[in-house]
Structure formats: C-alpha cells, structure tokens
C-alpha cells in the first residue's frame, strides 16, 4: 500500500521556483545598467505610476464630482399600473412576489408602483411604495393600494 501524502512532504516542482535576480551587483549578472538601458528617464529615475508622458493626465481631464452620494438612497424597481392591469387581467390580490413571478421586476429588490397608463381591473396591490397617481388610479378602479414601507 502506498504511503499517504502529507502536507509537510510536498515540494514544488523542480525549476518552478526560480531565485529572484539581484540586479546592479557586479558585471557578471545584470550589473552596471541593471536592465534599465543606457539613457533616458527610465534609466535615471522612476516616473509616477499615473504619468502619461506629458499628455494631460486622466485625473485632470475628468470633471470634479459635485454633491455627495446619499448613503440612505433606496433604488426602487418600477412597475406601472398599465403593466399590472395587463399581467393580472382577472383582478384579485397582487403582492411583490406575484409581480416578480409575472416577470415585471426582479426579485429581492424594493418595488414602486407608478401611475403610467390606465387600469380598469380591480386589484388589491401590496408593494413597497406607490406614487400618488398610482394610488388614485388603483382606487378609482375599485381596488386598494397598500404600501409596506
């Protein structure tokens, strides 16, 4: 029976770990210019990582950003009342899960119902948020609009 391989017995393949070349340590191996060539900026000193050869750098070409990013901003997925009327033509109760199942929005994200279009079906809609016009149109059609947030 073969011996079990143990972690402390593992060794890298021969030649896979080459020693680092120390440059500039005598004429025998990469001495004198140390792989930098003879003259020029690269031979004399390092240039900054963002240096673009005299061209106007990207951080100066782009405009400064104004304002700030609100950490409490919530991005809602929107669905219009016309889409709800088309997807749920039989009426009844409609939840966010039903809207996701109908393919109108993606799952695991808050949903806002907007009032674009017409609705003539009685729907009891439960969603995260509603616009005023959406609530008016849903209630005018005989349904209810319940916001969960």
From Swiss-Prot:
Gene: rplO
Family: Belongs to the universal ribosomal protein uL15 family.
Subunit and partners: Part of the 50S ribosomal subunit.
HAMAP family in the record: Ribosomal_uL15
GO cellular component: cytosolic large ribosomal subunit
Protein name per Swiss-Prot or TrEMBL: Large ribosomal subunit protein uL15
Keyword list, A-Z: Ribonucleoprotein, Ribosomal protein, RNA-binding, rRNA-binding
Described function: Binds to the 23S rRNA.
GO molecular function: rRNA binding; structural constituent of ribosome
Biological process annotations from GO: translation
Region (Disordered): 8-49
Biased composition annotated in UniProt, kind: Low complexity: 31-45
InterPro entries reported for this sequence: Ribosomal_uL15, Ribosomal_uL15/eL18, Ribosomal_uL15/eL18_sf, Ribosomal_uL15_bac-type, Ribosomal_uL15_CS
PANTHER family: 50S RIBOSOMAL PROTEIN L15, LARGE RIBOSOMAL SUBUNIT PROTEIN UL15M
A Pfam family it matches: Ribosomal_L27A
């Amino acid at each position: 029976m073969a011996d079990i391989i143990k972690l402390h017995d593992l060794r890298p393949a021969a030649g896979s770990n080459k020693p680092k070349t120390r440059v500039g340590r005598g004429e025998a191996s990469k001495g004198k210019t140390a792989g930098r060539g003879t003259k020029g900026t690269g031979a004399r000193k390092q240039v900054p990582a963002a240096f673009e050869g005299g061209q106007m750098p990207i951080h100066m070409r782009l405009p400064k950003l104004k304002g700030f990013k609100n950490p409490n901003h919530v991005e809602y997925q929107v669905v219009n009342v016309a889409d709800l009327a088309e997807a749920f033509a039989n009426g009844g109760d409609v939840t966010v899960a039903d809207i996701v199942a109908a393919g109108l929005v993606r799952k695991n994200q808050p949903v806002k119902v907007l009032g674009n279009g017409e609705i003539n079906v009685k729907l009891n809609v439960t969603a995260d948020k509603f616009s005023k016009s959406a609530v008016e149109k849903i209630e005018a059609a005989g349904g209810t609009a319940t916001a969960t947030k």
